[in-house]
């Protein structure tokens, strides 16, 4: 079943979500807590394709999630479908299916200044790579902005 890909706020908890390419897509503010996201082998692409509108505070937030897949080094955490995509992944286990660079710019060099792809205290083989310079590693203080209470209050 599909969730709407429109502006709005969505909350997913203890959910299993799978897909091939861009299976988390759209412009909503969506908070994923303790979810499992499986990249299927036929996809070989991207978990997220954020399209947050300019000025929207949040995009996709993943907290205490598991990113799994069967084929090593075949997927990215995300790419910017639109120039202001926002994806933050915190405290999550990243499998070895995620490429070392983690994020892809989809040949949108100008988006390096406008997208916000960030990580915080992730672990696992896919979290250990060298991320692009235009992505962010959050500090403890910055990560507080991405709690459930901060996003939905």
Describe the function of each predicted region.
Residues 1-153:
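Sequence-level preference for short, compositionally simple segments enriched
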């Amino acid at each position: 079943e599909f969730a709407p890909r429109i502006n709005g706020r969505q909350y997913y908890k203890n959910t299993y979500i799978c897909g091939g390419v861009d299976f988390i897509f759209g412009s909503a503010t969506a908070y994923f807590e303790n979810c499992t996201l499986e990249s299927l082998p036929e996809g070989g692409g991207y978990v997220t394709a954020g399209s947050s509108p300019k000025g929207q505070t949040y995009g996709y937030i993943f907290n205490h999630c598991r990113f799994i897949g069967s084929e090593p080094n075949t997927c990215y955490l995300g790419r910017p479908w639109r120039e202001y995509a926002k994806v933050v992944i915190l405290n999550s286990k990243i499998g070895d299916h995620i490429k070392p660079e983690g994020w892809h710019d989809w040949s949108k060099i100008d988006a390096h200044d406008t997208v916000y792809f960030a990580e915080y205290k992730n672990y696992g083989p896919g979290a250990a790579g060298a991320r692009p310079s235009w992505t962010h590693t959050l500090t403890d203080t910055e990560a507080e902005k991405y709690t459930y209470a901060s996003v939905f209050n």
